[in-house]
């Protein structure tokens, strides 16, 4: 089931419709929404996909949320075996506010966030300050407890269906989340906490991702082929659209046979790439170390923002 962002060019969507029409296993979500960063659309899109599954009468064992930047890093046959061996487990992070590394915690839901963080940051900040000073904090919806976690999950269809039913009983509770901060890290997690017993929640997903020290997602390139193949996960993100070698390797892995080996721990974060993580920042900064296989974003905007000269030191050459 594919949700295609409503902001995408109509011509691109028309080509997707044509391709999907020839493949009966593919369904397109009719009710498309815009999926901007931190917007409710990132929650609404997967919910609309669940409704599409329900309306079609499909009965999957699991629903796995992936983006266009995700690719498999293990055989699909191995994934099927893993889900069979762990039937009934919900693969999602469900944590209290301590899960949030820094920044707003309970403020995420106590106050209303109407403005786009990336394009209306000043208005967002002024609105938050005004609400805080005027004492306009609100209560969390009755019967729910705020929970947080990564937006990348794999849930049983029974839980997805129960979630849709519970949301439909009292639509005002879901409406509350339209104005929370980063709802995709809160909504599904909160409902899973309310509907599923703790023993059935794995507290990890099946998708590997990493962030830089500046909070930006690491984009995996062609030099990460061996690293990605070694991951204890079933999917990896974000994969660069230009990483043709890595994309081909991932697709080859997906179509390969299941070797039947016992599964080790799946889900624990790996931080064995710390130098790469620290080096790959959104923009270059003084004292930053770069690596020969790293692509640095040196746009005109970045260069114009440099108030003082930069000195770049090269070497030593590896022997």
Please identify what each model-predicted range represents.
Residues 1-319:
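ER/Golgi luminal nucleotide-sugar-dependent glycosyltransferases, focusing on the catalytic module
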């Amino acid at each position: 089931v594919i949700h295609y962002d409503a902001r995408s060019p109509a011509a691109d969507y028309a080509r997707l419709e044509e391709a999907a029409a020839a493949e009966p296993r593919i369904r397109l979500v009719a009710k498309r929404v815009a999926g901007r960063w931190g917007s409710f659309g990132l929650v609404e899109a997967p919910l609309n996909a669940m409704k599409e599954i329900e309306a079609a009468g499909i009965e999957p064992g699991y629903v796995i949320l992936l983006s266009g930047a995700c690719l498999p890093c293990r055989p699909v046959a191995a994934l099927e075996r893993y889900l069979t061996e762990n039937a009934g487990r919900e693969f999602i992070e469900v944590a209290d506010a301590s899960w949030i590394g820094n920044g707003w915690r309970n403020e995420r839901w106590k106050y209303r966030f109407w403005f786009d963080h990336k394009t209306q940051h000043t208005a967002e900040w002024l609105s938050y300050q005004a609400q805080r000073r005027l004492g306009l904090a609100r209560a969390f919806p009755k019967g729910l407890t705020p929970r947080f976690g990564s937006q990348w999950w794999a849930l049983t269809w029974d839980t997805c269906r129960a979630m849709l039913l519970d949301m439909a009983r009292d639509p005002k509770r879901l409406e509350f989340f339209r104005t929370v901060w980063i709802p995709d890290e809160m909504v599904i997690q909160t409902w899973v906490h309310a509907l599923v017993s703790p023993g059935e929640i794995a507290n990890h997903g099946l998708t590997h991702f990493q962030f830089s020290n500046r909070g930006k997602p690491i984009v995996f390139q062609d030099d990460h082929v061996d690293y990605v193949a070694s991951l204890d996960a079933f999917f990896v993100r974000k994969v660069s659209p230009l990483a043709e070698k890595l994309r081909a390797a991932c697709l080859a892995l997906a179509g390969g046979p299941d070797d039947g080996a016992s599964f080790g721990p799946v889900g624990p974060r790996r931080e064995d790439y710390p130098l790469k993580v620290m080096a790959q920042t959104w923009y270059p900064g003084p004292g930053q170390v770069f690596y020969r296989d790293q692509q640095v974003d040196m746009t005109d905007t970045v260069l114009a923002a440099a108030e003082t000269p930069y000195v770049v030191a090269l070497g030593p050459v590896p022997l």
